[in-house]
Regions:
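N-terminal alpha/beta PP-like core and its mobile active-site loop of ThDP/TPP-dependent enzymes
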Residues: 1-131
Length: 131
């Protein structure tokens, strides 16, 4: 109704419970940003207990699914996820955040030297033109 996305923050163990919500958001064309925790960067790919490829599972259920492996680029990925969730047909997007990055601190302007443009509010694009 408002075209503003909801945010669902899920820990690593709760990802399986978020999958039905992703399917529902996809079916209802609801803009939802799912931020899920995953195993630490050091332990990814080691076959640890409860380690799953959440990005691959969420990919067919969302408009965008990505794992953030560089904490200084969080702003960039969140901005992209927001735009994708609300533009065109609204829908769910998924950001996977390793636990070690999730509990780290980063400067608000981190990574700005790589993308020196200002992040300003933009009107959302419409799925169809004004009548």
């Amino acid at each position: 109704i408002t075209r503003k996305p909801a945010v669902c923050l899920v820990g690593p163990e709760g990802f399986a419970n978020a999958v039905p919500a992703m399917m529902e958001a996809w079916g209802e064309r609801s803009p939802v940003i799912f931020v899920t925790g995953s195993s630490t960067l050091k332990r990814q790919g080691a076959g640890g207990f409860k380690e799953i490829d959440d990005v691959a599972i969420a990919e067919p259920l969302t408009k965008y699914s990505v794992s953030i492996t560089d904490g200084e680029r969080i702003n960039e990925f969140v901005d992209r996820a927001y735009k994708i969730a609300v533009n065109g047909y609204p829908g769910a997007v998924h950001l996977s955040l390793p636990v070690d990055i999730m509990f780290s601190s980063f400067d608000e302007n981190a990574g700005r030297q790589e993308r020196p443009f200002d992040l300003t509010a933009q009107a959302p694009a419409r799925a169809w033109p004004e009548p």
